Amino acid sequence: ARKLGLMSYRAANEWRERFNRARLPKSENKKMFDIEFEVENYLNHNSKKFVSMFDPNCYLYLSRAMDLFDVAEHGGTVNAGLAKIHTKKNLIIGVESDILFPIDQQEELAEGFKKAKKNFKFEKLKSIQGHDSFLVDEKNFSKVIYNFFND
């Protein structure tokens, strides 16, 4: 399951750029279904590392909280729910390669803030790191966040 998670947090272009179809060095003792590709090795290593560091219950609670959250529940519509948010300014960052939170959802959120007459800034970023780009693409995100807080 963790390997599937890792794959969906990143974009296909990044996987292709980093690994393509590169194989591990040949081994004399290799069995039919042993790890053969570098990407498999990466996924195997990182999934084992992750499992040793995190309690799976954290993800159950996080997943449940995400399932239960609905901004429209607090006003009947997304726009009405967003109108109830009391902030001075809002930053929405969408990443074109994010398949978990697609860019059209971020655009819908920006449109909702616009209709609710909220002070917001919407930034659409290009990054090959997909959903994880907010963690690893410091160069792009830092600039946007810095500018937002210093405007």
Enumerate the language-model features and the residues they cover:
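Long, compositionally biased charged/polar accessory segments in the mid-to-C-terminal portions
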Residues: D55-N57, Y61-L62, I92
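Acidic catalytic loop of the alpha/beta-hydrolase fold
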Residues: K49, M66-D70, E96-F101
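Catalytic active-site module of serine/aspartate enzymes centered on a nucleophile-bearing elbow/loop
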Residues: E107-D151
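Active-site nucleophile elbow and catalytic-triad environment of alpha/beta-hydrolase enzymes
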Residues: H45-N46, L62-L82
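Substrate-recognition/cap regions that form aromatic- and gly/pro-loop-enriched pockets
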Residues: E73-L82, S97, P102, F120-E123
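Short alpha-helix in the alpha/beta-hydrolase fold that links the catalytic acid
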Residues: H74-N79, K89-N90, P102-F113
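Short beta-strand/loop motif that positions the catalytic acidic residue
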Residues: I85, L91-G94
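Alpha/beta-hydrolase-fold enzymes
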Residues: A1-K49
